[in-house]
């Protein structure tokens, strides 16, 4: 698979030969959906909670006698049928939202995403991204020159200047190959991968 190599002006020059196993795989929508949903589910904190009829603070006194009033029978005001009563099936912090995805499926899903990004022209390779100082303006000007507004940068090692300069830019993220997740790959309009990171991705996923 040939990947486009961009220069500092965002123009396409030479090409980089990449592994077909990682960047030339068929598009598998069902697998990608499963991998993305599992990633989102595993990121949930599970901190939502409601109270059931046992946990709400209400008196246990019977509101009125069982018979003779003409009203519907009632046992206590904490009943789920009453306003302010407990929930029937409340959410609990102990809920487990995690989804298990096998390593082979996870790798195959990432390969399918990388391959589709390459086919759509959303994935490009750069020699390296080097900043002389940790200045957000320097990085913003570089992206403006390259015509980028929403970009995920995958680099072999995260340079401190690059990391500090990118923190205040919206729709910009910088990660190492081992931390590339399926949701970020799909979310950003453009994915820039350094030459050294391409080799690391191939080593991780092939």
From Swiss-Prot:
Key words, A-Z: Ribonucleoprotein, Ribosomal protein, RNA-binding, rRNA-binding
Gene3D superfamilies (UniProt xref): 3.40.1370.10
GO cellular component: ribonucleoprotein complex; ribosome
Molecular-function GO terms, alphabetical: rRNA binding; structural constituent of ribosome
Quaternary structure annotation from Swiss-Prot or TrEMBL: Part of the 50S ribosomal subunit.
Cited function: One of the primary rRNA binding proteins, this protein initially binds near the 5'-end of the 23S rRNA. It is important during the early stages of 50S assembly. It makes multiple contacts with different domains of the 23S rRNA in the assembled 50S subunit and ribosome.
Family per record: Belongs to the universal ribosomal protein uL4 family.
The protein's name in its UniProt record: Large ribosomal subunit protein uL4
């Amino acid at each position: 698979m040939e990947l486009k190599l961009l220069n500092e002006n965002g123009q396409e020059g030479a090409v980089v030969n990449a592994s077909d196993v990682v960047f030339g795989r068929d598009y598998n929508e069902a697998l990608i959906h499963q991998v993305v949903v599992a990633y989102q589910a595993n990121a949930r904190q599970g901190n939502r909670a409601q109270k059931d009829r046992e946990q709400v603070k209400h008196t246990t006194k019977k509101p009125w006698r069982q018979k003779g009033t003409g009203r519907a029978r009632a046992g206590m005001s904490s009943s789920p049928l009453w306003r302010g009563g407990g929930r029937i099936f409340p959410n609990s912090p102990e809920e487990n939202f995690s989804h298990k995805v096998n390593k082979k499926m996870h790798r195959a899903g990432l390969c399918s995403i990388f391959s589709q990004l390459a086919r759509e022209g959303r994935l490009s390779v750069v020699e390296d991204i080097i900043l002389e100082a940790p200045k957000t303006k320097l990085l913003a000007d570089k992206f403006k020159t390259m015509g980028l507004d929403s970009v995920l940068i995958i680099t072999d090692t995260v340079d401190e200047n690059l990391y500090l300069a990118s923190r205040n830019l919206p729709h910009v993220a910088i990660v190492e190959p081992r931390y590339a997740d399926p949701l970020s790959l799909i979310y950003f309009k453009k994915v820039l991968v350094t030459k050294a990171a391409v080799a690391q991705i191939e080593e991780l996923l092939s």
